[in-house]
């Protein structure tokens, strides 16, 4: 059986990157929560 995690930088950025977070209301909520928590890194991209 193959491993399920087959990393791809493009796919990672498109799904979880800053611009995709900013594109939706809930994504912006995620960023706000991470800022409030004081995360040094907000997104993967």
Curated annotation (Swiss-Prot):
Any one GO cellular component localisation term in the record: ribonucleoprotein complex
For the keyword Protein biosynthesis, the answer is no
Please name the InterPro entries in this protein's record. Answer: Ribosomal_bL34, Ribosomal_bL34_CS
Q: What GO MF terms are annotated?
A: structural constituent of ribosome
Which PROSITE patterns does UniProt cross-reference here?
RIBOSOMAL_L34
Pfam families in the record? Ribosomal_L34 (PF00468)
| GO BP of this protein | translation
| Membrane-crossing residue ranges in chain numbering | none
Q: Which domain of life is it from?
A: Bacteria
Keyword vocabulary terms for this entry: Ribonucleoprotein, Ribosomal protein
The record's comment on protein family reads:
Belongs to the bacterial ribosomal protein bL34 family.
> What is this protein's name?
Large ribosomal subunit protein bL34
Q: Origin organism of this chain?
A: Streptococcus suis (strain 98HAH33)
């Amino acid at each position: 059986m193959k491993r399920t995690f087959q990393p791809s930088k493009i796919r990672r950025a498109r799904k979880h990157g800053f611009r995709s977070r900013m594109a939706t209301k809930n994504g912006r909520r995620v960023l706000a929560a991470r800022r409030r928590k004081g995360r040094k890194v907000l997104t993967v991209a």
